[in-house]
Amino acid sequence: MSLVDLGKKLLEAARAGQDDEVRILMANGAPFTTDWLGTSPLHLAAQYGHFSTTEVLLRAGVSRDARTKVDRTPLHMAASEGHANIVEVLLKHGADVNAKDMLKMTALHWATEHNHQEVVELLIKYGADVHTQSKFCKTAFDISIDNGNEDLAEILQIAMQNQINTNPESPDTVTIHAATPQFIIGPGGVVNLTDETGVSAVQFGNSSTSVLATLAALAEASAPLSNSSETPVVATEEVVTAESVDGAIQQVVSSGGQQVITIVTDGIQLGNLHSIPTSGMGQPIIVTMPDGQQVLTVPATDIAEETVISEEPPAKRQCMEIIESRVECAEIEEREALQKQLDEANREAQKYRQQLLKKEQEAEAYRQKLEAMTRIQTNKEAV
């Protein structure tokens, strides 16, 4: 049996999941060949869900990232069909989790397209990039939304947030450059974290006010920076425990002698403060508002001055970038569609030329046949 025949039989055995036949053929020297589409034995085993055959081929040294004519890898095949166990064994053997096919789609795209939640979770676990866009400018999250799969959309959204959140510090922070009493401002009130006897809070009322007014009240409520260790701040309202602080209040972050107060204001109206002991504050406070503005407040003893620095919100910038990216992708798709139509027209023209040539050859053969018959008839008549 020739090597070509051995290679063909290996492809058939891998497609059928015949482990013993695969071993025998490889022992007899069957090459790791492919079919006319570039499909290898490992592609077929992964596509048809033959786990043990996949392991046999991987141990034998078949390329784990082999490509078909459309650049699909065995991982693409397994993910598209929902074979989670084969996806995992391929990844354990070092398959490229972010490999892209001709449509620039990864295994995560295909698993999402076919609603294979277990495979999606497995790919994310092994480091699949959830932000990768296909040739059609679609992420896996976009595909899940298009398919109406809310469970997958939630999983992918969480994964996207986890991969983006590389900076642990919140952008909406207030930094005080001194060893001041530590406060948290949230919907539950202004909480003093330095009181050894407990955590004291000043409750907010129901009337609406700005974050700036709240910070001014905080400046009055806090002790002087130079004497912060001597005079703890205690509000005139009720004393609460740390467990009663609202869960939405962010934690104070200390770094390099700085205290960072994070104010949670999205969707919450802060009310007027109740009675608070008045005392000075020796340092200004810089607040980054949720809409991207930065406001500088100074103590009441200094000249009151506000400096508002407006900048484009990050969300708006990101939205504009997405829109520009999609417009660019749409233009690329249009050019590619036109090129595809041109190529198709050229192929049709070539096809008609070949058909015409064939007809001409047939006509010539028929003419010669008629001439031969005429000569034979003439000879008979002459005799």
Curated annotation (Swiss-Prot):
Cited Pfam families: Ank (PF00023), Ank_2 (PF12796)
Keyword hit for Transferase: no
Keyword Transport among record annotations: no
MF annotations from Gene Ontology: transcription cis-regulatory region binding
Domain of life: Eukaryota
Residues bearing PTM N-acetylserine: 2
ANK repeat extents: 5-34, 37-66, 70-99, 103-132, 136-166
Modified residues (N6-acetyllysine): 69, 340, 369
Recorded GO CC terms: cytoplasmic ribonucleoprotein granule; nucleoplasm; nucleus
Effect of residue 69 to R: Decreased acetylation
Posttranslational modification: Acetylated by EP300/p300. Deacetylated by SIRT7, promoting heterotetramerization and activity.
UniProtKB keywords: Acetylation, ANK repeat, Nucleus, Repeat, Transcription, Transcription regulation
Effect of residue 340 to R: Decreased acetylation
Location relative to the cell: Nucleus
TM segment ranges: none
SMART domains to which the protein is assigned, alphabetical: ANK
Coiled-coil stretches: none
A GO biological process held by the record: positive regulation of transcription by RNA polymerase II
Role this protein plays: Transcription factor capable of interacting with purine rich repeats (GA repeats). Acts as a master regulator of nuclear-encoded mitochondrial genes.
Record's subunit section: Heterotetramer of two alpha and two beta subunits. Interacts with HCFC1, causing repression of transcriptional activity.
Name of the protein in its database record: GA-binding protein subunit beta-1
Gene label: Gabpb1
